[in-house]
Curated annotation (Swiss-Prot):
It catalyses: L-histidine = trans-urocanate + NH4(+). It comes from the Bacteria. It is found in: Cytoplasm. Keywords: Cytoplasm, Histidine metabolism, Lyase. The gene is hutH. It comes from Paraburkholderia phytofirmans (strain DSM 17436 / LMG 22146 / PsJN) (Burkholderia phytofirmans). Pathway: Amino-acid degradation; L-histidine degradation into L-glutamate; N-formimidoyl-L-glutamate from L-histidine: step 1/3. CDD domains: PAL-HAL. It is an enzyme of class 4 (lyase). Its EC number is 4.3.1.3. This is Histidine ammonia-lyase.
Length: 507
């Protein structure tokens, strides 16, 4: 059981929520603030004075006053009319994150929602009865309205849920946990709908995957250094301290650790090669820049995970209702776009190392990493696949946040496109995982071909993990299953765990 303390979620907690179903309970210390804010909204509604989101229309219809006897209908209509998402459902881990983030935001006591509504959401979450939320339909301002409307509709008994391995009507899902459809009171529908939780959940989920890919790329890159008989001198700490970028310093340290004790490296210590190609030599500089961007994105997304991104905001101590723009997901969009650049570059650099390894002139290995070339093509077309994926990533990495289309009759005239920025990270991550699996296979093949010289003790663990599932490439054979097998090792974190570097989300 995880105690959710609104405004104090940590990256390790968020990673745990993404990776497994852990039961949640609301920190009792948050109850007073939630109840006070709900009462403040009830008092405002009772007075009948115009207050946006409580007794007015929405967006361009904000100047329309709604009679007191229609306030519940207003909230129901808001939820149903905004549930317009399209496309495939969000994955269950993303929905878990989305709900946890929404609970944290509501729990800070500035949204005006009753605790019983939050507890109903927690009951569904804990029973693993999760809303079916289409992944497309949000522009990231005013918040993630469509996705959150689908989440909210479940509480009304509308829409669908995933439960017990099945997709079923929301009414059946509610019945499974002993709940009846709720009637939302003043402001509650808007409190549930308004916020950046969908884009932030998508960005966090994909960021955790990219963190694992980063650690994997350190490992595969180090293995490629040994396979190509590259030098370890470019990883000397003195070089990187003179430049001063922390990511570069940390990446170089990881390469030194991984390559420490390599017999292959010792075997060519006195060779006449002066400098390696950039894809080997400049790994700390490139991967360090990626690391700095990823750490910054993690800080931004953690802030957003703990933020109140509702509108309007209620301040119970003064009774004020303040309209602002915390729903605008520009910080999330920028963070996701920066993660996209980093993930694409990780894959691009790995593709270049694969190209180096299969080129006999550069690597000194047999052409395409196979003996008896000609009758055997070896890794020739595996590299083509890596090139195709790296190229695709370059298009996917185009920033979504540079685009904006006005909506709601120009009331919402600038939007963030954060949800698309976060969503396409998943495609980039999948491509990069496959590129890294091809590099791991190529580098392992190269290390095998350096026998009797051996790689380092740290990298031998990588060799063992790869060779447990995929044998040395002797002759041409049906190659796709080999790539798929190593991709599974990449995506389940098996290879990442062999990296000496870790992220804040893992601590």
């Amino acid at each position: 059981m995880m105690t959710l303390k609104p405004g104090y979620l940590t990256l390790p907690q968020l990673r745990q929520i993404a990776r497994e179903h852990v039961a949640l309970q609301l920190d009792p210390a948050s109850h007073a603030a939630i109840d006070a804010c709900a009462q403040a909204v009830a008092d405002i509604a009772a007075k009948g004075e115009p207050a946006y989101g409580i007794n007015t229309g929405f967006g361009r219809l904000a100047s329309t006053h709604i009679p007191h006897d229609q306030l519940e209908l207003l909230q129901r209509n808001l939820v149903l009319s905004h549930a317009v998402g399209v496309g495939e459902p969000m994955s269950r881990p993303v929905v878990r994150l989305l709900i946890a983030l929404k609970l944290s935001s509501l729990g800070r006591g500035h949204s005006g929602i009753r605790r019983e509504v939050m507890e109903a959401l927690i009951t569904l979450y804990n029973a693993d009865v999760l809303p079916v939320i289409p992944v497309k339909g949000s522009v990231g301002a005013s918040g993630d309205l469509a996705p959150l409307a689908h989440m909210s509709a479940t509480l009304l008994g509308v829409g669908e849920v995933f439960a017990k391995g099945e997709r079923m009507p929301a009414t059946e899902g509610l019945a499974l946990v002993g709940l009846k459809p709720l009637t939302l009171q003043a402001k509650e529908g808007l409190a549930l709908l308004n916020g950046t939780q969908a884009s932030t959940a998508l960005a966090l989920y994909n960021m955790f995957a990219i963190e694992d890919l980063y650690r994997t790329a350190l490992v595969s890159g180090a293995l490629s250094v040994d396979a190509a008989m590259g030098s370890v001198k470019p990883f000397d700490a003195r070089i990187h301290e003179l430049r001063g970028h922390q990511g570069q310093i940390d990446a170089a340290g990881a390469y030194r650790s991984l390559l420490q004790g390599s017999g292959i490296n010792v075997s060519h210590a006195d060779c006449d090669k002066v400098q390696d190609p950039y894809s080997l030599r400049c790994q700390p500089q490139v991967m360090g820049a990626c690391l700095d961007q990823m750490r910054h994105a993690a800080n931004v997304l953690l802030l957003e995970a703990n933020a109140v991104s509702d509108n309007p905001l209620i301040f119970p101590d003064t009774g004020e209702v303040l309209s602002g723009g915390n729903f605008h997901a520009e910080p999330v969009a920028f963070a996701a776009d920066n993660l996209a650049l980093a993930a694409a570059e990780i894959g691009a650099l790995a593709e270049r190392r694969i190209a180096l390894l299969i080129d006999a002139t550069l690597s000194g290995l047999p052409p395409f990493l196979v003996r008896d070339g000609g009758v055997n093509s070896g890794f020739m077309i595996a590299h083509v696949t890596a090139a195709a994926l790296a190229s695709e990533n370059k298009t996917l990495a185009h920033p979504a946040s540079v685009d904006s289309l006005p909506t709601s009759a120009n009331q919402e005239d600038h939007v963030s496109m954060a949800t698309f920025a976060a969503r396409k990270l998943g495609d980039i991550a999948e491509n990069t995982a496959n590129i890294l699996s091809i590099e791991l296979l190529a580098a392992a093949q190269g290390v095998d071909l350096r026998a009797p010289h051996k790689t380092s003790p740290s990298l031998q663990k990588v060799m063992d993990a790869v060779r447990k599932d995929v044998a040395h490439y002797e002759l041409d054979h049906y190659f796709a299953p080999d790539i798929a097998a190593v991709t599974r090792l990449v995506q389940d974190g098996t290879i990442a765990k062999l990296s000496p570097l870790s992220f804040a989300s893992e601590q």
